[in-house]
Amino acid sequence: MKNYFKFLLMFMGLISYSQQYQWTGASGNNDFFNELNWKHTATSEIPLENTINPGQIIEFELFITCEVIADDEINLGENGKINVINGQLNGHSVTGLGQVILGDSSYFNLNGSYPIGGGVTVIFESNTSWVRLNNIEPTTAYYYYHDSFYHDNQTLSYPENLRIDNYYHNGSVIRPNILSNPLLKFFSDFNLEGEFGNISNSDLFIGESIPAYLNNDISSFILKRGHMVTFAENNDGTGNSKVFIASEEDIIVEELSNYLNNKISFIRVLPWNWVSKKGTAGDIQYMNNDWFYKWSNNGSSDLNREYAPMAWGKGAADDENDVEIIVDKYKSTHLLAFNEPDDCNGQSGQYGNMCVVDTSLTYYKNLLKSGLRMVSPACRQGAVFDWLNEFNSKAIEQNIRIDVIAVHWYDWASNPENSPNANPQDVFNRFVNYLESVHEMYGLPIWITEFNANRHRNEWVHRQFLQLALPFLEETNYIERYSFFPPTTQVANFFDSNDSFTQIGELYNEFMSTKSITETRYVSSSNLDSENYNFEQIECNPDDEFLSINSLELDEEIIIYPNPSSDYININTDEEIWKLQIIKMNGEKIDLSPSGNGIDISFLSKGIYILNFNNRIIKFVKN
């Protein structure tokens, strides 16, 4: 029954033998423009030669599963449609007057500089779908395409019910922010069996609020691509816990390890956001970066950048309101803990006894309730080897998770006051040795949230140091993010007094950054657990997705009237109704209750549907 209803509605006596073709991949390649890869949904005939060509108007309705590549312009006529369900179309651009309809697990990726023509409509049928514009940044995508996306005959609006997120440096991902198909599905038994529950939003699910009464009873799960999930053993986010990131592929875990199996009482699913390594310390515009932080929890993400909130000190972590502030952050996936709490005479450590490790750990523990990926307190340069080491050891003893290590580095150990003209290569070598030592101690990804060559060094040293450091940071796998912090002496600022780039600002701005997390599916290690999961590549077979009319078991004795209908339908039966369900084209099931006026279908979009009446299957049409 797994695939029974996928594409059911298109292939069982469609209203007419219209020009509808389904993807087969029969030619042995995945070329959209090869007619041998298509067949008619009713007759199985192949389209005529040169009827599906680049730039040529296509008036067919096409149904796609699996992965298809269109490396040139798709031109859809007024009747042209592309339906994608449980598949992926990687293309250059789509133009014309037609529609692209994205169902469950459907992804439309475009590389062109002008990827979507003004007459094209994109219809989202599911929240597990996206349009990715690889070379259009979010602000440009919003400006040109914000009115091109629909759901249930309504234009989607950013940010109310449409997300536009950055896809690394130059791209954007557009997806509906609607409650529809599950983003996370979890099961009581191994191998995706037993009782199951679904989560379709970013709310916190704790203890008895976990769907299907599966508190402490989860053994396997499916996480849809473009999302992350945090699982934890205890209701406050502590205990055995782990973050899974389904960046560009679904994560399917058929057997949770003993570390989490039947121990999950805390779940939070979040939309993933694709960022490069380079960021800024402070809300600084025009630096070609994908993320920033600002030593506080009062910032906001914008279209092109993810904001990483920081709980600077005790006042941002000591009550439930502080947690709510973090939970409500739009587009934030990580939480930075305290700023230099090791300093009893300055920064956050001077307030509320935060320089005492036990005190800081108490408030850090409260932050785990946010369900975000956790970044450690950022200590002064040397304190990462003692104060933070003690913090981490006690966190491990109390089962308090740290996912990422944050560091500050200013080359203080080299007597910088007396070496304003230090050799940049020597400065760089010390920087590398420091980071390698930190990684050797903790074995976790590193965020360098503040660094420079030291405020006592001149501009030339800073600039030469950066020219050495930036390529190293990009090439080093354990460096996940970094943000250069110009010294307070203003010797190495990004901008001059006229707000023009300095040489250092120009260098930082023009340096192209790479992906912060390169894996398409990522299991985040932490101070508590470094166990990884092996994921098998799932093979897609179009024949498994498209079912022929002969395989369907329609009930010919039950009649629906009127059919087609625009508002209500009735069933010619005296049977007691114990099951009544509409099944949409994307497989979504809608449970219904009959009324005296019949079955209300006015809320449905036009199309073909299945009615499951007491497990008897009947087709009807909404017009």
Regions found by a protein language model. Name each.
Residues 1-20, 549, 611-613:
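Bacterial Sec-dependent N-terminal signal peptides
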Residues 15, 546-623:
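C-terminal outer-membrane/trafficking sorting elements
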Residues 21-28, 40-46, 60-73, 77-179:
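Extracellular beta-strand-rich, repetitive "passenger/adhesive" scaffolds
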Residues 149-277, 284-285, 299-301, 516-520:
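Compact beta-sheet-dominated domain cores in extracellular/mature segments
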Residues 275-336, 343:
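N-terminal carbohydrate-binding/catalytic regions of secreted carbohydrate-active enzymes
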Residues 294, 309, 339, 388-437, ...:
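Aromatic- and acid-rich polysaccharide-binding/catalytic face
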Residues 308-309, 313, 468, 472-546:
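Aromatic-rich peripheral "rim/lid" segments of glycoside hydrolase catalytic domains that contact
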Residues 346, 376, 441-466, 485-497:
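Active-site clefts of carbohydrate-active enzymes
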